Amino acid sequence: MTWIPLHCHSQYSVLDAMSSIKDFVAKGQEFGIPALALTDHGNLYGAVDFYKECTQKGIQPIIGCECYIAPGSRFDKKKEKRSRAAHHLILLCKNEQGYRNLCILTSLAFTEGFYYFPRIDKDLLRQYSEGLICLSGCLSSSVSDAALKSPEALLLELQWFQDLFKDDYFTEVQLHKMSEESIAGFKEEWLKQEYYSLIEKQIKVNTAVLEASKRLGIPTVATNDIHYINANDWQAHEILLNVQSGETVRIAKQNTHIPNPKRKVYRSREYYFKSPAQMAELFKDIPEVISNTLEVAKRCDFTFDFSKKHYPIYVPESLKTLNSYTEEDRYQASAVFLKQLAEEALPKKYSSEVLAHIAKKFPHRDPIDIVKERMDMEMAIIIPKGMCDYLLIVWDIIHWAKANGIPVGPGRGSGAGSVLLFLLGITEIEPIRFDLFFERFINPERLSYPDIDIDICMAGRERVINYAIERHGKDNVAQIITFGTMKAKMAVKDVGRTLDMALSKVNHIAKHIPDLNTTLSKALETDPDLHQLYINDAESAQVIDMALCLEGSIRNTGVHAAGVIICGDQLTNHIPICISKDSTMITTQYSMKPVESVGMLKVDLLGLKTLTSINIAMSAIEKKTGQSLAMATLPLDDATTFSLLHQGKTMGIFQMESKGMQELAKNLRPDLFEEIIAMGALYRPGPMDMIPSFINRKHGKEIIEYDHPLMESILKETYGIMVYQEQVMQIAGALASYSLGEGDVLRRAMGKKDFQQMEQEREKFCKRACNNGIDPELATVIFDKMEKFAAYGFNKSHAAAYGLITYTTAYLKANYPKEWLAALLTCDSDDIEKIGKLIREAQSMGIPILPPHINVSSNHFVATDEGIRFAMGAIKGIGRGLIESIVEERDHHGPYESIRDFIQRSDLKKVSKKSIESLIDAGCFDCFDSNRDLLLASVEPLYEAIAKDKKEAASGVMTFFTLGAMDRKNEVPICLPKDIPTRSKKELLKKEKELLGIYLTEHPMDTVRDHLSRLSVVLAGEFENLPHGSVVRTVFIIDKVTTKISSKAQKKFAVLRVSDGIDSYELPIWPDMYEEQQELLEEDRLIYAILVLDKRSDSLRISCRWMKDLSIVNENIIYECDQAFDRIKNQVQKMSFTMSTSGKETKAKGNKPNENGHTQALAPVTLSLDLNELRHSHLCILKKIVQKHPGSRTLVLVFTQDNERVASMSPDDAYFVCEDIEELRQELVTADLPVRVITV
């Protein structure tokens, strides 16, 4: 008998069900089920993916939802238990009207009814029931509640739904009955009783519902409330539930684990995808409940029409005065308007200077004719493809943003290849000059719509989105939902935490997963250590097994960083919407690909902070010099800019801040804008290997060769190296007579590795090339090179547009360094680490950072003749409104003359005593009196007197004193306290740092600054330039001490937050050193430390080996520090090694130093290796094992043969092991190596 599952959950029932769409549909196919329903909790998140997967597998998809229905009104949100906030109800789409109504219902559930859950109510059901089939629901339904109350209540509830849905209402029965063997698997008596209670309730409800349904003539269906695929998935599902709840599924007790009674748990283990035979057996006494499911499926006939678009239209002003017009007239008017905009912009965008560059490329033609030809060609493609509306909608958004002072980027993606977009102001880089192709943007050989991605100033993005909402209607615009999934490492950590596994052990497993793109199964295949751990350790195996089940599960929802959907009419006519978590932001329920596939227009509006920085800098420059700069009109041959790049001073330059980019800039020494474009395209995995050759060819150190003379003009600007995707298109055209459109099809095929199409293209390319007189063998060689290149080739249009941003930031830094760094400091004012780097960069350029000043500072950092003035907006606790009132008063009535004048002129409703005190402690009033304690003491009496004076003046009361005061400006009498508390310099600086995030006017280290050179101190900013294993001397202030207990050894250790005046970082102090030098670990203490730098992993790890209090510095202290440094440096040099038999330098992945501590006096660890049995493979395994246990103990290798010691070696290259070697010893035994530990 055929059974159709009608009540099924996927992982889109977030952290409640674990079935992936793919596995769910595959299981249905395995069972030979002709139709499947998806009914996730309260949403349609997975509907499109489910539909596509089903149709691909030949299964009828039924789109549905298990809705939450409020017991009363959806607007009633009284504080009551979560379990009472809503009942459950299944709704299935019969047809398109049903789908539309389900979209509306699930949308309103979020936007109007959300309370614990997205809820609808009976009022909404009355309005939007057409086209829907309703099932009564599970034990959490209102029908089940009524069945447990009384027969009368049940009849009333059923009649309400029957009256509404008529023949499309079905009651639902479920029975999650377990076998006796399975019941015996319950370890807890309370859970067993919960199970019996569940079954008792289900039987009671089923009996009542069947009887009442029969009486009312309502058909009944059997469902199983599927939450996972296989019967043995119940444990992984329980873990998933408690990832959500935050509970552990078990708790430690003595030396074992017991189940956690507080955990979230299903009372039966039968919520899996059962076969039709199993369901038929379960309901063998009432077979009609099985057959009725097929009847439901037959009634459902909804299909998505993926060919239909629901794009908005653009109505030109010329039509808005007309009473009526046809769609054809409207589109024609849009096309005319588009062309009109382009033609009007032609003289402005194509100035004589821009045309001169085009003339250089085409010396025998009028450049304006070339531009017009290109424009006409683009229009001839865009208009017939129906894309005018799209371009005008994007133009409208960008035009509004620019008109309202919101900076917009020069372009992003392939759109920069369009002359039309350049004329419309959508992009700002002229494409003909830089060989950027329209066909890379819109391919005339293909029907697909292009993407126009827009970068917008971060600060103005929300305003732009609000404009789109206002322009197109709030019901027609939404942002796009995203789904965060459990990657392998996250799955391991979630499972480990939920199983209450030791954190160190969880981290040990997780560290074997190298990156976000590596799956757990791949890691098991490729990492022998992880595989051994899985085989030999039961607890680790359990974590890995459960993580394998949960990997890929949806963990949370979010909002797409850029995507905005604009619909031609109300969104809910086509898709469901929701409200993003913890906000009022409307988002689609479908993620990016599904939402586009159902015909929604996506516009990418990406907030780019660099544009904000550019805008702030250019505004400051104009205010100072009167010169108005614009990205599009900067000279692209500025010598000062290129000189800056030659020096590698790329800090603060867009996409060039990394050390690798600094080196590339220094070595390449770019002197053309085209080379900046190439740098951005080259510095990526893949093409990065070509960088040395690119540099050498530029500087004449390597011969530039071309496979064919026709390729020279194409590859000349990149020194004979293929860098851009557009070059593939050009080569195909030059050698094989491809049109640019055909070349783009070839590029796509290569990029997608479509082997079938590639063979067709290979044959086509070689045949055409041969027809053009090219040797067949050479044609094949060139095609192979193109194919290999296409795997990493970059979009030149995008590289050029972003290259312009890079150049602009370099230009500003080179020519207006104070204004540029001030802008960067403003935009990064909430990032203390970035502030430190920028301050260090400013100081390296001879630009001082000045403390905040009440008469100079504003919300932003400000460039002045003397340096960069610290921003009031970066002072903790000082809000924008207060700053605006201070600056406005200052601008209107002149500088403040004293603290008294400031308070007198301030709106005391906005300016509190506390905020004035913060401004004083931040240094804003040092210009009036450097004694901050005296200024603080004056605030209370001044504030009270002036406030009283203002109050009396406002009420019209004039005392004898205030009358006189009106003629004597700012002389309201005050009385200062006799004993003004005086803080130490250390306390003053500590308060300043608390407010500014950094020490600014002075630093506690200034007391030892003169001794730093004698101590050979290296500050944190230089750490990244030093090699792995470096032993460094440094000085810092302890800002914060956090004491912790190591999970394994149960010993105290500390994590220090330290700073050296510019940079701050964390420094772990492990147990042994903590015990020895605990008394030094106090906040605000000045410390000299000897550190070892570990750069074996992607991030820098720092090990502290010695510390000394520097509150007093004398010759003896300096001598002691020097001696300690020499001693530790010698120890570290002895501890490093190279595996001589491997012939390669060890480059192990770094591991966090052992919690048990680093000291300089620990005994070495000696390993004995038997040469009679030793193999190279043994050494490789030994190397891996040793690398996994780094620490501070010297490692000595003793080689024996025939029980005789024949050689020994001490490691070099910073190689040493942890103090507690028990794990190391055990791992050596497990690995079955001819190695034994002979001394510890």
From Swiss-Prot:
UniProt xrefs under Gene3D superfamilies: 1.10.150.870, Bacterial DNA polymerase III alpha subunit, thumb domain, Metal-dependent hydrolases
Compartment(s): Cytoplasm
Catalytic function, reaction form: DNA(n) + a 2'-deoxyribonucleoside 5'-triphosphate = DNA(n+1) + diphosphate
Any one GO molecular-function label of the UniProt entry: 3'-5' exonuclease activity
GO process terms (BP): DNA replication
EC number(s) reported in the record: 2.7.7.7
Gene Ontology cellular-component annotations: cytoplasm
Main subcellular location of this protein, as a coarse class: cytoplasm
Keywords from the UniProt entry: Cytoplasm, DNA replication, DNA-directed DNA polymerase, Nucleotidyltransferase, Transferase
Highest taxon in the source lineage: Bacteria
One Pfam entry name: PHP
InterPro entries per UniProt: DNA_pol3_alpha_NTPase_dom, DNA_pol3_alpha_thumb_dom, DNA_pol3_finger, DnaE2/DnaE/PolC, DNAPol_HHH, PHP_dom, Pol/His_phosphatase_N, Pol/histidinol_Pase-like
Function: DNA polymerase III is a complex, multichain enzyme responsible for most of the replicative synthesis in bacteria. This DNA polymerase also exhibits 3' to 5' exonuclease activity. The alpha chain is the DNA polymerase.
Family label: Belongs to the DNA polymerase type-C family. DnaE subfamily.
Assembly behavior: DNA polymerase III contains a core (composed of alpha, epsilon and theta chains) that associates with a tau subunit. This core dimerizes to form the PolIII' complex. PolIII' associates with the gamma complex (composed of gamma, delta, delta', psi and chi chains) and with the beta chain to form the complete DNA polymerase III complex.
Protein name: DNA polymerase III subunit alpha
